[in-house]
């Protein structure tokens, strides 16, 4: 597994993946030291395209990503993550709407859990999911980052 650190306007982001694709995009919020398994190898070149696209996203120049993804999760989680990728830039959806979109309308809580476990932040836009009341709700990296991303996209 390779990794690199992308310096974003809201702090460092850990990128990790292998030949199958990108497996992790995680905010390093509040972490003084980056800890990765000993078997991981730092390789900025491997993530050049993902970093370029993230840079363009934060500059407001990119609305959808085109990088190979290989998230690890259950089939249900992957179905939720695929549904998240269908939420257009600048728009939001509720957990209930995502549940309906994946054909399981009573699974909004399970959708919330899968959303929280999304290993590929930003690119799989879990930040675009809001509560049924239209309010910002839980975000693994903190509501301040969620609000920043939604404001960047013009949906908050």
From Swiss-Prot:
HAMAP family: OGT (MF_00772). One of its GO terms (biological process) is DNA alkylation repair. This is Methylated-DNA--protein-cysteine methyltransferase. It is found in: Cytoplasm. It comes from the Archaea. PANTHER family: METHYLATED-DNA--PROTEIN-CYSTEINE METHYLTRANSFERASE. Its main location: cytoplasm. It comes from Methanosarcina acetivorans (strain ATCC 35395 / DSM 2834 / JCM 12185 / C2A). Belongs to the MGMT family. Keywords: Cytoplasm, DNA damage, DNA repair, Methyltransferase, Transferase. The keyword Methyltransferase applies. It catalyses: a 6-O-methyl-2'-deoxyguanosine in DNA + L-cysteinyl-[protein] = S-methyl-L-cysteinyl-[protein] + a 2'-deoxyguanosine in DNA; a 4-O-methyl-thymidine in DNA + L-cysteinyl-[protein] = a thymidine in DNA + S-methyl-L-cysteinyl-[protein]. The gene is ogt. The keyword Nuclease does not apply. Pfam families: DNA_binding_1, Methyltransf_1N. Involved in the cellular defense against the biological effects of O6-methylguanine (O6-MeG) and O4-methylthymine (O4-MeT) in DNA. Repairs the methylated nucleobase in DNA by stoichiometrically transferring the methyl group to a cysteine residue in the enzyme. This is a suicide reaction: the enzyme is irreversibly inactivated. SUPFAM superfamilies: Methylated DNA-protein cysteine methyltransferase domain, Methylated DNA-protein cysteine methyltransferase, C-terminal domain. The active site is at 126 (nucleophile). Its EC number is 2.1.1.63. GO terms for molecular function: methylated-DNA-[protein]-cysteine S-methyltransferase activity. This enzyme catalyzes only one turnover and therefore is not strictly catalytic. According to one definition, an enzyme is a biocatalyst that acts repeatedly and over many reaction cycles. GO terms for cellular component: cytoplasm. It is an enzyme of class 2 (transferase).
């Amino acid at each position: 597994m390779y990794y690199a650190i992308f310096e974003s306007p809201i702090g460092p982001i850990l990128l990790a993946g292998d030949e199958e694709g990108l497996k992790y995009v995680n905010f390093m919020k509040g972490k003084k030291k980056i800890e990765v398994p000993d078997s991981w190898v730092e390789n900025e070149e491997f993530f050049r395209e993902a970093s370029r696209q993230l840079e363009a996203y934060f500059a407001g120049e990119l609305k959808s990503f085109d990088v190979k993804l290989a998230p690890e999760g259950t089939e249900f989680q992957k179905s939720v993550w695929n549904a998240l990728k269908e939420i257009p830039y600048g728009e939001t959806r509720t957990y209930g709407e995502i549940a309906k979109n994946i054909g399981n309308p009573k699974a909004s809580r399970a959708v919330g859990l899968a959303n929280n476990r999304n290993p590929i932040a930003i690119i799989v836009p879990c930040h675009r999911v809001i509560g049924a009341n239209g309010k910002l709700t839980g975000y693994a990296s903190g509501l301040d980052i969620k609000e920043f991303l939604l404001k960047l996209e013009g949906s908050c």
